[in-house]
A protein has these predicted regions:
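Mixed-charge, Lys/Arg-enriched low-complexity segments
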Residues: 2-6, 46-94
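Short N-terminal "domain-start" leader segments
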Residues: 1-46
């Protein structure tokens, strides 16, 4: 799956170096959990960074960026919702 481009063209490898969630602090990303079936027939979940371009300067000035705990909590909540769907119930995810 192709990642969306960051707002200023910075490479994803640089943004996520050492910590997948570090982009939260710099770009005010929201996180989305994705369920997919891998080649071993197991369901796995991954996070996808989704840019939130609207209001970027205002948020920077006010210091109202997403925090790491909030991002992780959102990913977990979306993951739990997806795994509760009838089509995924009883599947193994990691």
């Amino acid at each position: 799956m192709e990642q969306p481009a960051p707002l200023d063209g910075t490479e994803w490898q640089e943004i996520t170096k050492g910590n997948w969630f570090c982009g939260v602090y710099r770009y005010r990303f929201d996180f989305e959990a994705i369920i997919q079936l891998n080649e071993n027939g197991r369901y796995e979940w991954a996070t996808r960074l989704v840019t939130e371009a609207s209001g970027e300067p205002d948020c920077e000035d006010s210091g109202d960026y997403a925090t790491l705990p909030r991002a992780e909590k959102k990913v977990r909540a979306i993951f739990d919702e997806l795994m509760a769907l009838p089509s995924l119930r009883g599947k193994t995810a990691y």
